[in-house]
C-alpha cells in the first residue's frame, strides 16, 4: 500500500510538471505543414465538398497550447491557444498542403486581467512580431493610410497601421473603453497575417481579451482573388495576374481619394511587396 501510494504521489508530481508549462506545437505551411497537423490530430481530416479540407486542433483550459508558427528566422510563438485549424485547397492542380492557418488564443494566460496586464501582453506580442521581421501590410486595393493617422484609423476603421509605434497605456485604455476590437495586417516573405484583439467579457474591473489569427500564403490569397486563379497557369495566369493588379490600382486610387476627403493622410512611399514570385 505504501509503495502504491508513493507511486501515485510521484505520478501526480510528474503530471503537475508536465502541465506547469504549456506544450509547444510547431505548425507551418505547405505539404510539410499538412504532415505536422496530422501528427498532432486526434480526429480525422474534415473534407468539404466545396474543395477544402480542414485540419483541426483544440485545447481546453487550463491546459492551453503554445504554438510556434515555424517560418525560419520569421517564426513566432502564439501563447494560450484554444484552437488551430489548417486548411488545404483541394481544387489546386496539385497538393500544395496547408495554405491557411487560423488560431484562436487568449491575450493573457489568465481569463480576466487588468488593463495593465493586457497592455503588457500586447507590447510583448507586437515586440515579438517586430523582431521576427513582420511588416505593415495594406491590401493592394485599399488605401495606404499614413502612420500619423494610426489612432484615427483604429477608431474609424478598426485597423492598426503603425504596429510598432506602441500605444501608451492611456491610449490602449482609452481605445478599448470606446471600441471592443482592433486588427492589424502584416506580411512576411509570402505569408499574410491578419490578427484581431477582441475585448469579449468583463468581470468586476477586469477584462477578457481574445486573439484571432488568420494566416494565408500570399499564393492562395492572390490566386483566390483572380477568376479561375487555380485553373490558370503559365502566360494565362501572368496575364490574369497583371489585369488584377491594374484593377487593384484603380480601386486604391478611388479609396485614397475618399480617405483624403475624410481627413486621412496617404503614405505614398508604401510599396506593395512583389508577390508574383509566390503566385507563378
For the regions a protein language model found, what residue spans apply to each?
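Stable alpha-helical elements in mature extracytoplasmic
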Residues: 21, 33, 37, 118-128, ...
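A cross-kingdom marker for long, charged
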Residues: 215-280
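Bacterial signal peptide processing site
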Residues: 10-13
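Long, charged/polar, surface-exposed segments that mediate recognition or autoinhibition
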Residues: 86-164, 179, 206-242
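Amphipathic, interaction-prone secondary-structure segments
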Residues: 49-54, 59, 69, 174-200
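C-terminal motif of bacterial Sec signal peptides marking the signal peptidase cleavage site
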Residues: 6-8
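Compositionally biased P/S/T/G-rich terminal and signal peptide-adjacent segments
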Residues: 18-104
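Broad, structure-driven detector of short, well-ordered beta-strand segments within folded domains
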Residues: 76-96, 183-184, 189-204
Amino acid at each position: 500500500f505504501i509503495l502504491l501510494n508513493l507511486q501515485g504521489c510521484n505520478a501526480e508530481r510528474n503530471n503537475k510538471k508536465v502541465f506547469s508549462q504549456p506544450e509547444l506545437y510547431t505548425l507551418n505551411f505547405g505539404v510539410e505543414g499538412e504532415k505536422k497537423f496530422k501528427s498532432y490530430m486526434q480526429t480525422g481530416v474534415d473534407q468539404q465538398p466545396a474543395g477544402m479540407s480542414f485540419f483541426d486542433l483544440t485545447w481546453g483550459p487550463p491546459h492551453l497550447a503554445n504554438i510556434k508558427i515555424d517560418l525560419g528566422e520569421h517564426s513566432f510563438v502564439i501563447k494560450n491557444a484554444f484552437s488551430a485549424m489548417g486548411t488545404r485547397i483541394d481544387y489546386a492542380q496539385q497538393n500544395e498542403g496547408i495554405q491557411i492557418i487560423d488560431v484562436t488564443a487568449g491575450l493573457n494566460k489568465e481569463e480576466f486581467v487588468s488593463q495593465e496586464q493586457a497592455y503588457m501582453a500586447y507590447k510583448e506580442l507586437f515586440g515579438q512580431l517586430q523582431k521576427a521581421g513582420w511588416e505593415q501590410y495594406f491590401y493592394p486595393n485599399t488605401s495606404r493610410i499614413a502612420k500619423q493617422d494610426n489612432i484615427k484609423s483604429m477608431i474609424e476603421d478598426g485597423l492598426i497601421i503603425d504596429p510598432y509605434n506602441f500605444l501608451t497605456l492611456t491610449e490602449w485604455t482609452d481605445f478599448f473603453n470606446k471600441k471592443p476590437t482592433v486588427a492589424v495586417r502584416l506580411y512576411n516573405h509570402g505569408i499574410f497575417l491578419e490578427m484581431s484583439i477582441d475585448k469579449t467579457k468583463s468581470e468586476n474591473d477586469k477584462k477578457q481579451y481574445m486573439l484571432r489569427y488568420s494566416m494565408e500564403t500570399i499564393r492562395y490569397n492572390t490566386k483566390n482573388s483572380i477568376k479561375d486563379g487555380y485553373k490558370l497557369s503559365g502566360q494565362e495566369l501572368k496575364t490574369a495576374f497583371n489585369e488584377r493588379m491594374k484593377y487593384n490600382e484603380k480601386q486604391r486610387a478611388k479609396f485614397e481619394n475618399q480617405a483624403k476627403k475624410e481627413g486621412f493622410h496617404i503614405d505614398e512611399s508604401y510599396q506593395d511587396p512583389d508577390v508574383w514570385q509566390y503566385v507563378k
